């Protein structure tokens, strides 16, 4: 994140630890009652998401990659203001979920306040409790990692699980996906910056 509120975003979905299992699953039609998408369907879905993101004002340099050898996918883009990333989330959410309403804001940054917020407005607890035990197993070994890099110096973070880099220019929050799904831990974080 640049001091003026512009920056770069990258989302990485790394399933490489499950590569052997995913190779087997990819040869099946269904698993645990869920249809298994083909590689072509997955590539098409990422291409659709890329197009949706690219249509968002203030967003540029949109790129998606899908690696079926290592099972790593990524989406990256450049934004003119942090609020443009909120628009990206709303646009993708609307395209994928129809009439369901996306949160208005998950990121907040005002250059004058020197405070960056990653809000935790998603709740998966009800959906998680409805999952089969086989589906719930996925969450036990999955992790969520958020790394934020800044031009300014990090002086404080609100989430006690956050680690700040020795340079004071980056933070990392790594949580078990099960703890997030059951709301034992939060991805919310207020990061205070200074010049």
Language-model regions: role of each:
Residues 1-58:
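Start-of-domain marker
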Residues 55-195:
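Mature, soluble, non-transmembrane domains
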């Amino acid at each position: 994140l640049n001091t003026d509120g512009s920056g770069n975003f990258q989302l990485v979905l790394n399933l490489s630890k499950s590569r052997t299992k995913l190779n087997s699953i990819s040869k099946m039609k269904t698993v645990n009652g869920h249809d298994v998408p083909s590689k072509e369907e997955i590539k098409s879905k990422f291409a659709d998401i890329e197009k949706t993101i690219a249509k968002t004002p203030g967003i540029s340099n949109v790129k998606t990659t899908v690696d079926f050898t290592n099972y790593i996918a990524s989406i990256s883009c450049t934004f003119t203001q942090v609020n443009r990333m909120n628009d990206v989330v709303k646009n993708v959410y609307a395209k994928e979920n129809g009439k369901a309403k996306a949160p208005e804001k998950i990121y907040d940054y005002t250059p004058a306040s020197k405070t960056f917020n990653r809000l935790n407005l998603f709740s998966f607890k009800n959906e998680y409790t409805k999952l089969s035990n086989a589906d719930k197993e996925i969450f036990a070994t999955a992790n969520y990692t958020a790394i934020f890099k800044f031009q300014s110096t990090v002086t404080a973070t609100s989430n006690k699980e956050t680690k700040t880099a020795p340079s004071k220019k980056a933070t990392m929050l790594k949580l078990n996906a099960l703890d997030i799904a059951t709301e034992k831990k939060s991805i919310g974080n207020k990061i205070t910056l200074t010049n």
